[in-house]
Amino acid sequence: MLLYHIVGASVLICLLNETAKAIIGVDECQATPVIHFLQYPGCVPKPIPSYACRGRCSSYLQVSGSKIWQMERSCMCCQESGEREASVSLFCPRAKPGEKKFRKVITKAPLECMCRPCTSVEEYAIIPQEIAGFADEGPFTTSAHFRRSSDLQ
């Protein structure tokens, strides 16, 4: 009976730990094996083993602790950290006279993967919700805390 409680408690702790990781947003970014199909017009596509960066990284948008009228954002993305190149020969049976039957193609793959800042959004690219028409309805317009700036006058 004691063993049953210990095993049950261990399973519960593991489940809670995984749930906490998902809620907190633990960084999980790694190089994952994939198969890429290299193609070139007139050549036979060739599958080659490669790597891709896959995973998730912590990101957030929140009200600033010191300036409540401003927002703080952190946007992290799973990206490559360095790259490697490989030269692969493709067979081209439909090569025109004078062209080679084999063509060298250069391909790239990530060397390592890590959470790095996403490309920044320029201020001019952000359209206020009032202009975009998104703030006309929804939970933020009916809340006493979130009113359109035109309603405050």
Swiss-Prot record:
Signal peptide: 1-22
Cystine pairings recorded for this chain: 29-78, 43-92, 53-113, 57-115, 75-118
Gene Ontology biological process: animal organ morphogenesis; chitin-based cuticle sclerotization; cuticle pigmentation; sequestering of BMP from receptor via BMP binding
CTCK domain boundaries: 29-119
Record flagged with keyword Signal: yes
Keyword Mitochondrion: no
Any one Pfam family match given in the protein's UniProt record, by short name: DAN
Top-level lineage group: Eukaryota
Complex formation: Heterodimer of burs and pburs.
Name the record gives this protein: Bursicon
